[in-house]
Amino acid sequence: MGEGHRTIRVGYGVMARWLNLDDVPGLLAPGQRVFVAGSCGEPQAMLAAIAADPDCAREVTFVQQPLPINQYDLSSFHKSAHQETFFVTPSLKNGLATGGVLFTPMQMRNIFDHVAGMPVDIALLSAARDQQGTIRYSANVDYLDAARAAARAIVVEVSEAYVAPLTCPVVDEAEVDYLVSCDSSVMTYPVTEPDETSAVIGAHIARLIRDGDCLQTGIGAVPAAILAKLSDKNDLGFHGGLIDDGVMTLIETGNINGQSKPIDTGRHVTGMALGSDSLHQWLTTNESVMFRSANYTHDYQVIAQIPGFVSINSAVEIDLFGQINAEVAG
């Protein structure tokens, strides 16, 4: 291990205790599989501590599904480290080329079961306090329940720099091994401004959406353009993997109210929030957004109960696995 590095025995099943950030590398050991929350739930401070003590990552396999806002290639922490992923971002390009990143194409619903069934030694998660001071997980719960079920030990960094969404799951300290205080900022994603072509496409598709339909949206200029053209629709619902600024706007204007949904009536179901600081601020007081893991947001048996379900996604290109690149060519 690096100079000054000390190993900490993970106390499985004991009441959570608080650690310093520089204690986190001591939790890792060769041969471990470590789940790392992705997107806006990434435990930024703990990853920075691990990156600063790279020898702690020797022969460690990290599991993370990142989005473009996640900049780490976790396999780069040590020459013998690996990262298992189900989604490829530009930051993973070098790791893929060298074999450090192991890419398994998989649907999100199946990823949940895959994570729940794999041997996970440690889950690194993130949280913050809500306006009442209750510690809640960050605004990405897509695989949260799976990781909590699979992990032998759970470590949660708690940021004091932002306020947690009002409806994110509460961190039960009896189910957590360690808590780590930090001052990481909430992770935001730039709002997509549709270009002229996207706006035209958006207008065409918006005409196909009927009053009372339930929407699911993805990342990209075209979904953003479609949402921007729905101000004349009524009683729309929302059930999807992510909520963004466009969906927030339609909820605020009343176009999306969830009243036509036979399940989760009046609620807006999502696995994560991906957008501006304004979106995250809005979530600190909004009671209508319901965060659920991918075994609910992406389960066909759940979706089949929602009539008029409309999935809004876009593609720049499609690979041989049938996976869609939503934004970047080349």
Predicted regions and their residues:
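Conserved alpha/beta enzyme-core scaffold
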Residues: 8-330
